[in-house]
UniProtKB/Swiss-Prot annotation:
Protein origin, superkingdom: Viruses
Biological process terms in GO annotation: virus tail fiber assembly
Transmembrane segments: none
Protein name: Tail completion protein gp17
Subunit structure: Homohexamer. Interacts with gp16 connector protein.
Function, in words: Tail completion protein that caps the tail and interacts with the connector gp16, thereby attaching the tail to the capsid.
Organism this protein belongs to: Bacillus phage SPP1 (Bacteriophage SPP1)
Principal localisation: virion
Length: 134
């Protein structure tokens, strides 16, 4: 069996779900991997990923934890509402990608903090996806 990493395919599928979910896109200016210094709030950033093996006797897969960062304005409610829309976007339709089989997803963390500037609200979401190689 050939092993391959699912992280890039998973990231592409999650971005497609986020960008196609109208209730989210009505609330944010963009979904991006690397926002510009002067990009206006609010927006969603696809953050770090980590992967650990998920193996059985007959298959190889991964548990991939992905971070999603919500950069809101000055209210906690806005960051919470956008964070909720991110979770809705990840679950409103199946994640579609070739070469892998989606097994499960689990919310690991959802929190809103005040950024180091003392004003901006920052939502942090961690979701664990279990993916098998085909």
């Amino acid at each position: 069996m050939t092993w391959k990493l699912a992280s890039r395919a998973l990231q592409k599928a999650t971005v497609e779900n986020l960008e196609s979910y109208q209730p989210l896109m009505e609330m944010v200016n963009q979904v991006t991997e690397s926002p510009g210094k002067d990009d206006p709030y609010p927006y969603v950033v696809i953050g770090d990923q980590s992967s650990t093996p998920f193996e059985t006797k007959s298959s190889f897969g991964e548990n991939i934890t992905m971070d999603f960062h919500v950069w809101g304005g000055t209210t906690r409610a806005e960051a919470q509402d956008i964070s909720s829309r991110v979770l809705e976007a990840l679950t409103y339709k199946p994640l579609m990608f070739e070469g892998f089989t989606f097994v499960a997803k689990k919310l690991v963390l959802a929190q809103v903090i005040t950024d180091t500037d003392g004003v901006t609200k920052h939502g942090i979401i961690k979701v664990r996806f279990t993916i098998n190689n085909n």
